[in-house]
Structure formats: structure tokens, C-alpha cells
Regions:
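Signature of dsDNA virion morphogenesis modules
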Residues: 1-180, 199
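Enriched but not universal
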Residues: 180-199
């Protein structure tokens, strides 16, 4: 397997939702940052789409004891908007994926700004960062299936879900696989040519 253990990876995914609330002061965000068994095109090389799937059950033994909600993975602002450790960030694992609910601090302007940005749909995508424990790769479908996630670090509101850091690790993984596939094709071509010359 070509992935590097303990290397943090980032993925952009589904939109945030502002739930209807009878409490007009509540600043709640909901979303599904991880959707199981759904192929996602991570990149394309030479017209071939390289996909990734997070398998149902991949989070079964995942360390989710302390992950956070932030913005853009804390790159421009280190604000922690919610955290599992203090129960301001809650999650459930369903058949569909990982669902989160974050209770933001209405007294903090940064929290109000994030809530407003999501409410106005200026920010409507999520991303997550994690470390892979186990994965498999299908050379025929060019699909990497993550079967076990070791640790979840954060779920993040992202301004641009396709910004470079979102899939740096995935692109390097798929670039390695693409190079291997090309080398295997070249080796098969040479072998066929040698066999033709021998007979």
C-alpha cells in the first residue's frame, strides 16, 4: 500500500446546515463531513479519474476522543469553534456517515461571523482531516478505499473546498499509483515485445 502511515490527510465534503430552532439565539451548525461508500474523484491524471471511498465501518476503531470544528483547518485563524472534549461538538455515526452538531458561542464575534457566513451560504462546505490506518487500492477502477481511519483531527468550515491543502496527500498517493500503473504497462509491453522476438 502506497499511503504513508500517520500522515494527516484533508478532504472537502458536504455542506453545512443551519437547523430550524425555536431558540433564536442558538448558534448551531450541523453537517455530515464524512459520507460512507460514496466514490469521490480526488484527481485526474492523463484522463483517468482517481477516486476514493471511505468504507462503512472505517470509523469503528477511530480515535475521535478530541476533535474540533475550525475554519480552513486553522490555516489563517486558529479559532476553535467547538470541541468534542467539552461537548460543544457532538457527533453520531449513522449508516450514512459521520454527522456533527456544533454549538457555537453566541458571545464570541468570530462564532457569530462563522454562523452568519454559513447562514448566508458564503461558506457552505466542510472538510475533515484524518490519518489512515488501513486502505486498499483497486488498479482496475483506480479507487482507493479507506477501510480504517486511525484518528480524526478536525472538521472544518472551508471557504474553497478545493484549495491545495484539501487533497495534497491524496494527490501524492494517486500520483504514485499512476506512476506504478504506467510502469507496469511499459513492463508488459516490453515483455510482449521480447516474446514476439523470441518466437
Amino acid at each position: 500500500m502506497a499511503y504513508k502511515p500517520n500522515e494527516r490527510e484533508y478532504r472537502a465534503v458536504a455542506p453545512f446546515v443551519i437547523p430550524d430552532s425555536s431558540d433564536g439565539d442558538a448558534l448551531i451548525l450541523r453537517g455530515t463531513p464524512i459520507v460512507f461508500d460514496t466514490p469521490t474523484v480526488i484527481c485526474e491524471y492523463d484522463g483517468i479519474e482517481y477516486k476514493e471511498i471511505i468504507a462503512r465501518g472505517a470509523l469503528d476503531d477511530c480515535d475521535m476522543s478530541d476533535f474540533i470544528l475550525n475554519r480552513n483547518h486553522g490555516q489563517n485563524d486558529s479559532t476553535v469553534f467547538a470541541r468534542t472534549r467539552n461537548n460543544s461538538l457532538k457527533y453520531t455515526i449513522s449508516d450514512r456517515g459521520l454527522d456533527i452538531e456544533a454549538a457555537l458561542d453566541g458571545e464570541d464575534e468570530r462564532h457569530r461571523n462563522l454562523h452568519r457566513d454559513v447562514q448566508k451560504k458564503r461558506v457552505d462546505k466542510m472538510s475533515f482531516s484524518f490519518v489512515v490506518r488501513e486502505a486498499k487500492y483497486d488498479n482496475v477502477t483506480h479507487t482507493r478505499t479507506i477501510t480504517k481511519v486511525k484518528k480524526l483531527y478536525d472538521v472544518s468550515a472551508v471557504d474553497f473546498p478545493a484549495y491545495n491543502d484539501t487533497s495534497i496527500s491524496a494527490r501524492s498517493f494517486f500520483a504514485e499509483e499512476h506512476t506504478r500503473e504506467l510502469a507496469a504497462l511499459e513492463q508488459a509491453r516490453r515483455r510482449k515485445k521480447l516474446l514476439a522476438l523470441t518466437y
